[in-house]
């Protein structure tokens, strides 16, 4: 049944929003995996765990905003299976930050692609929504992760577990 509130909302935009919802939920799922990996008794880096748990919550909020947007525009929500993260063991701080950086870049590219679809279908509401709630935040997340990788690498944290511990404690706010 078609929505009575639907106006200037192309089916391609609707489908792309559904795909974006899935991507945000995948990102949330991946960050949850990272968070609880760092909470393990044999890893025990609470700052990393907290950081990734917050990222998971944020990605879930992004999905919720898209779900609300879809309903407000008269679109229909079609949830898809959420893919399992590519790994269960996340390794060291540098490795996981590089994975997180790639994840954020993938999400950013998907948002840019969604914006391009919305622009092509002349949907100023969707363009404004994406610009207001997503695009700048993605760039900030990418920059933050890049900075973390630079500082962890500078400390040679891959070979120096004390450096990783200190980064967790002082930069990530970990408390043991």
Curated annotation (Swiss-Prot):
UniProt keyword Iron-sulfur present: no
Keyword Iron: yes
Function: Stores iron in a soluble, non-toxic, readily available form. Important for iron homeostasis. Has ferroxidase activity. Iron is taken up in the ferrous form and deposited as ferric hydroxides after oxidation.
Protein name: Ferritin, spleen middle subunit
Matches recorded under SUPFAM superfamilies: Ferritin-like
Activity over temperature: Thermostable.
Field pH dependence: Stable at acidic pHs.
Keywords, ordered alphabetically: Iron, Iron storage, Metal-binding, Oxidoreductase
Family of the protein in this entry: Belongs to the ferritin family.
Species this chain originates from: Trematomus bernacchii (Emerald rockcod)
Gene3D superfamilies reported for this sequence: 1.20.1260.10
């Amino acid at each position: 049944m078609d929505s009575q509130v639907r106006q200037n909302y192309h089916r391609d935009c609707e489908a792309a929003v559904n795909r974006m919802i899935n991507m945000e939920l995948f990102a949330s799922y991946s960050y949850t995996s990272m968070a609880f990996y760092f909470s393990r008794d044999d890893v025990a880096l609470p700052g990393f765990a907290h950081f990734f748990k917050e990222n998971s919550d944020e990605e879930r909020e992004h999905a919720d905003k898209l779900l609300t947007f879809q309903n407000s525009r008269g679109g229909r929500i079609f949830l898809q299976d959420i893919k399992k993260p590519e790994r269960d063991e996340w390794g060291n701080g540098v490795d996981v930050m590089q994975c997180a950086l790639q994840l954020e870049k993938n999400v950013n590219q998907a948002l840019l692609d969604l914006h391009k679809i919305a622009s092509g279908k002349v949907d100023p509401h969707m363009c404004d929504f994406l610009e207001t709630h997503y695009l700048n935040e993605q760039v900030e997340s990418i920059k933050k992760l890049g900075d973390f990788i630079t500082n962890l690498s500078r400390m040679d944290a891959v070979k120096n577990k004390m450096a990783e511990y200190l980064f967790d404690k002082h930069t990530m706010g970990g408390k043991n």
